[in-house]
């Protein structure tokens, strides 16, 4: 057997393996790998927990969004009903106001017509009295004129009242 470089390389390799076994390097490497595997496993579990939490938050926010949309739709519907009610009420009040104003205007027109008719009648009566006075003054004496005048005034008063 020759003691060449291959032999010394083999002896060095064997000594290296013995030294590694003596220092328990495989156990340390195993522990390190186990620790790394545990760390990765914990990180995966944490990631799964965070994912589930995020999904529950998303579901909660979607539920809240749907509730908010439903509430907004309810508010809009209530506002529309109130606006329609206010519009109908305003229309009714406007119609009542117009009807009252029309009735008041018609009443004022009737009163003005009545006043005009009464004024025309009064003017006609005054004119008739004046004409009768002139005719009677020219045809009758003083005593007869006074009697006729009083009688005519009484008749006019009776007819006007």
UniProtKB/Swiss-Prot annotation:
Family: Belongs to the ATPase B chain family.
Subcellular localization: Cell inner membrane
One Gene Ontology CC term in the entry: plasma membrane
One term of GO molecular function: proton-transporting ATP synthase activity, rotational mechanism
Listed NCBIfam families: PRK09173.1
CDD domains attached to this UniProt entry: ATP-synt_Fo_b
Chain ranges passing through the membrane: 3-23
InterPro entries registered for this protein in UniProt: ATP_synth_b/b'su_bac/chlpt (IPR002146), ATP_synthase_B_chain (IPR050059)
Membrane topology field: Single-pass membrane protein
Principal location: membrane
Role played: F(1)F(0) ATP synthase produces ATP from ADP in the presence of a proton or sodium gradient. F-type ATPases consist of two structural domains, F(1) containing the extramembraneous catalytic core and F(0) containing the membrane proton channel, linked together by a central stalk and a peripheral stalk. During catalysis, ATP synthesis in the catalytic domain of F(1) is coupled via a rotary mechanism of the central stalk subunits to proton translocation. Component of the F(0) channel, it forms part of the peripheral stalk, linking F(1) to F(0).
Protein name per its UniProtKB record: ATP synthase subunit b 1
Keyword Cell inner membrane: yes
Swiss-Prot/TrEMBL keywords: ATP synthesis, Cell inner membrane, Cell membrane, CF(0), Hydrogen ion transport, Ion transport, Membrane, Transmembrane, Transmembrane helix, Transport
HAMAP family assigned to the protein according to its UniProt record, in alphabetical order: ATP_synth_b_bprime
Subunit architecture: F-type ATPases have 2 components, F(1) - the catalytic core - and F(0) - the membrane proton channel. F(1) has five subunits: alpha(3), beta(3), gamma(1), delta(1), epsilon(1). F(0) has three main subunits: a(1), b(2) and c(10-14). The alpha and beta chains form an alternating ring which encloses part of the gamma chain. F(1) is attached to F(0) by a central stalk formed by the gamma and epsilon chains, while a peripheral stalk is formed by the delta and b chains.
Pfam families reported for this sequence: ATP-synt_B
């Amino acid at each position: 057997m020759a003691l060449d470089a291959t032999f010394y390389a083999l002896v060095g390799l064997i000594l290296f393996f013995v030294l590694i076994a003596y220092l328990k390097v495989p156990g340390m490497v195993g522990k390190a790998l186990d620790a790394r595997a545990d760390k990765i496993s914990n990180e995966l579990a944490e990631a799964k927990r965070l994912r589930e939490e995020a999904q529950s938050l998303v579901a909660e926010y979607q539920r809240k969004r749907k509730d908010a949309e439903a509430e907004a739709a309810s508010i809009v519907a209530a506002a529309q009903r109130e606006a329609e009610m206010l519009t109908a009420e305003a229309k009714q009040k406007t119609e009542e106001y117009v009807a009252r104003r029309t009735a008041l205007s018609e009443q004022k027109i009737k009163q003005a017509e009545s006043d005009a008719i009464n004024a025309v009648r009064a003017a006609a009566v005054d004119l008739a009295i004046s004409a009768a006075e002139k005719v009677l003054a020219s045809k009758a004496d003083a005593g007869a004129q006074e009697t006729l005048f009083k009688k005519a005034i009484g008749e006019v008063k009776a007819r006007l009242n």
